[in-house]
Amino acid sequence: FITAAFGIPQISTGDMLRAAIKAGTLLGLEAKKIIDEGGLVRDDIIIGMVKERIAQDDCKNGFLFDGFPRTLAQAEAMVEAGVDLDAVVEIDVPDSVIVDRMSGRRVHLASGRTYHVTYNPPKVEGKDDVTGEDLIQRDDDKEETVKKRLAVYHEQTEVLVDFYSKLEGEHAPK
């Protein structure tokens, strides 16, 4: 909705990383190992990818970050680069709900269609509605991986709420 209303692109580091993984790039292979273990890809890699992306023409009128920044270093790098944010939104969801939602997700790899075992189940359990092919659970959606990612979130990302609430001057979200 926001991207359509303002004619701006959504910038998702997750999507950028998944594209690199699918393409089998060196970054993609390195990122896959880290993501599958529930960790965060190194800040320097993410910051570089984001700076490259926001320099593209379609970002000249703005952009919507999705899942970025995730660490204090990433947020500070954006401030140092003069990237001003109009608003920052935190969606506060209990860990138990996140685990349930993510671990219940199933994907048809060829098409990208996404289902959920409880909230959006396929017509036939474990099968894509269109092709009848198998659905898979991505490694990063497995319960133990989701719990590790949440621990990383609480350790590294939660501090951003405080960072942005204290940011002042021209770089402060309005």
Curated annotation (Swiss-Prot):
Asked if Ribonucleoprotein is a keyword of the record, the answer is no
Pfam families to which the protein is assigned, alphabetical: ADK (PF00406), ADK_lid (PF05191)
The organism's place on the tree of life at top rank: Bacteria
Keywords in alphabetical order, please.
ATP-binding, Cytoplasm, Kinase, Nucleotide biosynthesis, Nucleotide-binding, Transferase
Catalysed reaction(s) here are: AMP + ATP = 2 ADP
Give the SUPFAM superfamilies listed for this entry. Answer: P-loop containing nucleoside triphosphate hydrolases
Q: Which GO terms describe its cellular component?
A: cytoplasm
Keyword hit for Nucleotide-binding:
yes
Places the protein is found? Cytoplasm
Q: What's the subunit arrangement here?
A: Monomer.
Q: What is this protein called?
A: Adenylate kinase
